[in-house]
Regions:
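Hydrophobic ligand-binding cavity/cleft-lining segments
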Residues: 1-41
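Short, surface-exposed coil-to-beta transition loops
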Residues: 2-4, 54-58, 77-81
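Short beta-strand-to-loop capping motifs
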Residues: 9-11, 48, 97-99
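Hydrophobic pocket/interface hotspot
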Residues: 16-20, 26, 44-46, 61, ...
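Short solvent-exposed loop/turn micro-motifs enriched in small/polar/acidic residues
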Residues: 28-29, 54, 65, 75-77
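Short, charged/polar surface micro-motifs in flexible loops or helix N-caps
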Residues: 42, 50-55, 62-68
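Beta-strand/loop substructures that line and gate deep hydrophobic ligand-binding cavities in soluble
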Residues: 63, 69-124
Length: 124
């Protein structure tokens, strides 16, 4: 299942990109994540709580500062990206997500984007 959502953020693109590229921020805008640690330059370890169960996994995570884009993928087929573009005086943040099992809902994805927007706008 594929999802794509876009949200305007009233902050400069570099500020939005900085927030999403810092993996330690993930638990601040993805409520299911409880901890994130970088294991090497392109991989992160993630602790999360889904459907009442604690889960631990490692995912690839790359950040392209010039393109203001992050990408991630897990062995389970879960993958996605976020892209930040200039949008007038602010930014346009797009999130794309692909899952094999349809676990994520459009509401959850929209809530994640909204949490990022609130986080970044409160800090600029």
């Amino acid at each position: 299942m594929q999802h794509e959502h876009t949200e305007h953020v009233a902050a400069p693109p570099d500020a939005v990109y900085g927030a999403i590229a810092d993996v330690t921020n993930l638990p601040r805008f993805v409520p299911q994540m409880t901890a994130v640690r970088r294991s090497d330059a392109d991989r992160v370890e993630v602790d999360a709580r889904y459907e009442g169960r604690e889960q631990h996994g490692e995912v690839s995570f790359t950040a392209d500062e010039l393109a203001r884009r992050i990408e991630w993928s897990a062995p389970s087929g879960y993958r996605g990206w976020m892209q930040v573009d200039q949008d007038g005086a602010g930014s346009r943040l797009t999130l794309f997500l692909e899952t094999l099992h349809g676990a994520e809902s459009d509401h959850d994805i929209a809530a994640t984007l909204d949490a990022i927007r609130m986080l970044v706008e409160s800090e600029v």
